[in-house]
């Protein structure tokens, strides 16, 4: 199959309620196939929901272990929270793919963080998402 290079998907996110707040989410793995990495990201990390014509990215899990360990070596969400524990809601701004054949990822692929939404704001959106998804996301 040949040797895999270290690849990373970097997702640039913007806080839904504060346009000045931006976060970068990254997931790293060894793979030659970008589609495997994007599929792993979509299945293990985030769900996207379209509201009023805008696609929002919702962090569903903060687990640092993804289901397909032979594809995903490491995923790093650091302080990105689980949605069911309060969570954040972001609008996706851009998605970047980083790859290094020497196994090193440069500093340009590091993460920045944004702030937590207020409890009342989050509850309001959780209720809307619960209706949209057809099940209750609130504890």
From Swiss-Prot:
It comes from the Viruses. GO terms for cellular component: host cell mitochondrion; host cell nucleus. The keyword tRNA processing does not apply. Pfam families: Pneumo_NS1 (PF03438). InterPro entries: Pneumo_NS1 (IPR005099). One of its GO terms (biological process) is symbiont-mediated suppression of host cytoplasmic pattern recognition receptor signaling pathway via inhibition of IRF7 activity. The keyword Secreted does not apply. Keywords: Host cytoplasm, Host mitochondrion, Host nucleus, Host-virus interaction, Inhibition of host adaptive immune response by virus, Inhibition of host innate immune response by virus, Inhibition of host interferon signaling pathway by virus, Inhibition of host IRF3 by virus, Inhibition of host IRF7 by virus, Inhibition of host MAVS by virus, Inhibition of host RIG-I by virus, Inhibition of host RLR pathway by virus, Inhibition of host STAT2 by virus, Inhibition of host TBK1 by virus, Inhibition of host TLR pathway by virus, Interferon antiviral system evasion, Modulation of host cell apoptosis by virus, Viral immunoevasion. It is found in: Host cytoplasm; Host mitochondrion; Host nucleus. A motif (DLNP) lies at residues 136-139. Monomer. Homomultimer. Heteromultimer with NS2. Interacts with the matrix protein M. Interacts with host ELOC and CUL2; this interaction allows NS1 to form an active E3 ligase with ELOC and CUL2. Interacts with host IRF3; this interaction leads to the disrupted association of IRF3 with CREBBP and thus reduced binding of IRF3 to the IFN-beta promoter. Interacts with host MAVS; this interaction prevents MAVS binding to RIGI and inhibits signaling pathway leading to interferon production. Interacts with host MAP1B/microtubule-associated protein 1B. N-terminus is important for IKBKE/IKK-epsilon reduction. The DNLP motif has IFN suppressive functions like binding to host MAP1B. Plays a major role in antagonizing the type I IFN-mediated antiviral response by degrading or inhibiting multiple cellular factors required for either IFN induction or response pathways. Acts cooperatively with NS2 to repress activation and nuclear translocation of host IFN-regulatory factor IRF3. Also disrupts the association of IRF3 with CREBBP. Interacts with host mitochondrial-associated membrane (MAM) MAVS and prevents the interaction with RIGI. Interacts with TRIM25 to suppress TRIM25-mediated RIGI ubiquitination and thereby RIGI-MAVS interaction. Belongs to the pneumovirus non-structural protein 1 family. This is Non-structural protein 1. It comes from Human respiratory syncytial virus. The gene is 1C.
């Amino acid at each position: 199959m040949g040797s895999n290079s270290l690849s990373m998907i970097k997702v640039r996110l913007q806080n839904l309620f504060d346009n000045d707040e931006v976060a970068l989410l990254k997931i790293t793995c060894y793979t030659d196939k970008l589609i495997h990495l994007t599929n792993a990201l979509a299945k293990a990390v985030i769900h996207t929901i379209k509201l009023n014509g805008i696609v929002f990215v919702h962090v569903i899990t903060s687990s640092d272990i993804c289901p397909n360990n032979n594809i995903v070596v490491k995923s790093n969400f650091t302080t990105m929270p689980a949605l069911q524990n309060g969570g954040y809601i972001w609008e996706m701004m851009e998605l970047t793919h980083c790859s290094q054949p020497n196994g090193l990822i440069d500093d340009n692929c590091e993460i920045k963080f944004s702030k937590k939404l207020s409890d009342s704001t989050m509850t309001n959106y959780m209720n809307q998402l619960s209706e949209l998804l057809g099940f209750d996301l609130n504890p």
